[in-house]
């Protein structure tokens, strides 16, 4: 808060050291920037809690919108699935659900929400500037957290290149994305050697993956596909869903140990 607006610094917020390495030299900037803006109106503690609360609402909204049959038709299935995912307690620090966000991973939650919305605007929205909005949202994804961006980028690129949008709009959208993300991305990759290893150990048992509290999520997804009456709706999201399932299975069974790194310095 003090460094961003007084000195216009997007990095170097902390000059502290831990074990010989700079600690929190910078973090994903978007949520802290918004928190800093709110701090002009509210106490910092209230601003921070407000950002956490907004991330929870935005996550559920993004999943609901992503599962719509059309751009303006509310999806009760999507709302239910989003709510169940938010309330799952199988994990408490990986990010996305309520427990993880309250533990401090609300940046991850924002990243997932923005990524979901970017896919929605790319494949379902009828908005005149849907491609540009999608580019903005995928840029906000990387500014919120790196890991969801890395997972969503391939499928976003597939839909982006596959779309019938005229070429000059695609180029302008791509340049818009670069304008948003390039400053942070360059800083991150130039200093990648200083990022911290989370000593992540991947799960190897199915019982670790399928917990009792996510069974309603699985059941809701099955019911959605069975009862969906729109074949076009299923087609429009089938590639996206197959991709997410495939990449999740691959990372679950073949993700190397200690391969998950914090995008922070």
Model feature map: region roles:
Residues 1-265:
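Membrane-embedded transmembrane-helix bundle of lipid-linked glycan/lipid transferases
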């Amino acid at each position: 808060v003090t460094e961003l607006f007084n000195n216009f610094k997007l990095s170097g917020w902390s000059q502290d050291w831990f074990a010989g390495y700079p600690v929190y030299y910078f973090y994903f900037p978007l949520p802290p920037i918004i928190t800093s803006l709110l701090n002009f109106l509210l106490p910092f503690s209230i601003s921070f809690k407000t950002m956490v609360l907004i991330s929870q609402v935005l996550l559920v909204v993004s999943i609901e919108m992503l599962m719509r049959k059309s751009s303006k038709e509310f999806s009760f299935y999507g709302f239910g699935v989003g709510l169940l995912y938010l309330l799952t307690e199988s994990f408490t620090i990986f990010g996305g659900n309520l427990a993880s966000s309250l533990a401090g991973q609300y940046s991850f939650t924002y990243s997932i929400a923005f990524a979901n919305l970017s896919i929605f605007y790319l494949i379902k929205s009828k908005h005149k500037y849907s491609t540009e909005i999608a580019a903005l949202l995928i840029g906000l994804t990387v500014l919120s957290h790196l890991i969801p961006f890395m997972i969503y980028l391939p499928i976003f690129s597939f839909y982006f290149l596959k779309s019938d949008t005229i070429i000059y709009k695609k180029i302008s959208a791509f340049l818009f994305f670069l304008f948003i993300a390039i400053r942070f991305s360059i800083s991150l990759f130039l200093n990648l050697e200083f990022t911290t290893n989370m000593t992540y150990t991947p799960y190897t048992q199915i019982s670790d993956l399928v917990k009792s509290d996510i069974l309603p999520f699985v059941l809701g997804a099955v019911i959605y596909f069975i009862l969906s009456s729109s074949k076009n709706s299923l087609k429009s999201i089938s590639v996206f869903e197959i991709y997410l399932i495939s990449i999740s299975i691959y990372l679950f069974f073949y993700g190397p140990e200690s391969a998950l790194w914090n995008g922070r310095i």
